[in-house]
Regions:
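Bacterial N-terminal signal peptides that target proteins for export
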Residues: 1-7
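Low-complexity, intrinsically disordered Gly/Pro/Thr-rich segments
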Residues: 452-458
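Eukaryotic acidic, Ser/Thr-rich intrinsically disordered low-complexity regions
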Residues: 459-476
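Alpha-solenoid helical repeat scaffolds
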Residues: 7, 11-12, 16-446, 471-476
Length: 476
């Protein structure tokens, strides 16, 4: 299956769990926030007194500024950022705080400068590199990763590859994200990173490897919805429907905090259909119709899926019911939409479960519908004539009776195709077959040998060695 580009963002949102950063406890920041929220008239004075206790500690001064930033008091946040830089110009903390303030004020240029200053001030501190990379990840993923590669030179122990993978993934550069994820052991990844890795592989249509990564993730986090989802998706694409169904059951019934999406319903339904479990598939599609988070246009398509499933189990009444819902949901009609009803009746002719008497009624209905389609859509007249010619041969009647019903439509098809100046080789072959059927009709039904030979002559003009035409022309 080729996944359309416009679906990538939606699929990524559905599959991958959000990254949750681990935040270290900052006691100074928490203490200052408590003071600021107290409503005391002298709250700023209290903070100032506290800050004097560590006036030469850049990290703690920056923590005071972080508290002001959290309260959106940008002027005081800037004040403590400057104090942190003054206390120790070789510490990255004051510059990082200044960069974060600039980000909050939508000043990307100043933010970039401050984070770069942090890198220069303390090359071993990863936070300046990381904040710069995060800020640049959308505008210039390559610059972001270049900063991380510079960090690698300073801190070989730091998980640069994982961060780079996440940056490229967020930027939609799946191949580069995969390259960086490939460098990291699964054991060194958190659950959301394993999920993101497998998701990028899935969206790149590397279903085997995506399944392998998702399976490893599932073994570590068996109730993680993302891994059950990815196992269902990948196994469905690989047509291992039994495994896909098992994963689908876990996703729907044995996953923590699973938010079921339209993609989940769709893939689970596909897997059930692939395993010929049409009634179960109908049940899933019915759930999809009731789901609040499924869009109206998606629900419209589900009606067609349900109709197809009912057709597979020979429940044509239900198939027509849902097919009509599907058709009625389209504001404009079309040949293909209207033909789908005729096709539904035509399909009953080749279904062994359809009683002979019902086949006759279905044939008459299908033939009438195709006749109306031919009148309404003259550009499709040849197609319609050919369909009407083929249907009688599925009826439980003798060959002459079949030919009596089919013959006029073969003649109509042949007349249309013969007048076509730019026939393809395939169409010419269809024309010859129609002519041969017409000769049989004239010989065995109409008892008109002259007409049969006239048609046979036309065949010889196209195909001089045609044995059927030669045989007709040799008759006395």
């Amino acid at each position: 299956m080729k996944i359309k580009h416009i679906l990538l963002g939606a699929l990524m949102t559905v599959i991958a769990a959000p990254a949750i950063a681990q935040v270290e406890k900052d006691e100074v920041k928490e203490q200052v926030i408590a003071i600021l929220k107290s409503g005391a008239e002298d709250k700023h004075k209290q903070v100032s007194s506290l800050a004097k206790e560590f006036k030469k500690d850049a990290a703690k001064l920056a923590s005071v500024g972080k508290a002001y930033l959290a309260e959106k008091d940008y002027e005081n946040a800037k004040k403590y950022a400057a104090m942190a830089v003054k206390a120790n110009s070789k510490s990255a903390e004051g510059f990082i705080l200044a960069g974060n303030i600039a980000v909050a004020l939508d000043d990307a240029g100043d933010a970039a400068t401050q984070f770069q200053q942090a890198m220069y001030a303390d090359p071993k501190n990863p936070n300046g590199y990381r904040r710069y990379a995060q800020m640049m990840s959308k505008a210039s993923p390559q610059d972001a990763v270049n900063a991380l590669e510079a960090l690698r030179q300073q801190r070989p122990d730091y998980p640069v590859d994982l961060i780079a993978a996440e940056i490229y993934s967020d930027a939609g550069k799946m191949d580069l994200a995969i390259q960086y994820y490939d460098k990291v052991s699964i054991n060194d990844m958190k659950d959301y990173q394993i999920s993101d890795y497998a998701t990028n592989l899935f969206l790149s249509q590397n279903f085997d490897k995506s399944l392998s990564i998702a399976t490893q993730g599932h073994s570590k986090f068996p109730r993680n919805a993302s891994f059950n989802r990815l196992m269902m998706f990948n196994n469905t694409e690989k047509k291992d429907f039994a495994a896909a169904i098992a994963a689908g059951e876990r996703l729907f019934t044995a996953s923590d905090s699973a938010k079921i999406s339209s993609f989940d319903y769709g893939y689970y339904g596909r897997a059930l259909e692939g395993a010929d479990k049409y009634q179960e598939a109908i049940g899933i599609y019915e759930q999809m119709l009731q789901a609040d988070n499924v869009k109206a246009d998606e629900k419209l398509e589900v009606n067609k899926k349900i109709s197809d499933c009912y057709k597979k189990v020979s429940n044509y009444a239900k198939a027509e019911e849902y097919l009509n819902k599907y058709i009625q949901g389209h504001p404009q009609s079309s040949f293909s939409l209207e033909e789908s009803v005729a096709e539904l009746y035509a399909d009953q002719l080749s279904d062994d479960k359809t009683p002979a008497a019902q086949k006759q009624a279905s044939y008459e209905k299908a033939d009438a519908l195709y006749a109306a389609l031919g009148q309404k859509y003259p550009d499709n007249a040849a197609y319609v004539a050919n369909k009407r010619a083929q249907m009688p041969f599925s009826l439980a009647i003798d060959q002459k009776a079949q030919l009596k019903l089919a013959g006029p439509h073969y003649i109509e098809f042949a007349n249309i195709m013969a007048a076509k100046s730019n026939r393809s080789a395939g169409e010419t072959k269809m024309l010859i077959n129609a002519y041969n059927a017409a000769t049989a009709y004239y010989v065995h039904v109409a008892d008109d040998m002259e007409k049969a030979k006239e048609v046979a002559t036309k065949v010889i003009e196209i195909d001089p060695e045609n044995e059927n035409a030669k045989a007709i022309l040799s008759l006395k």
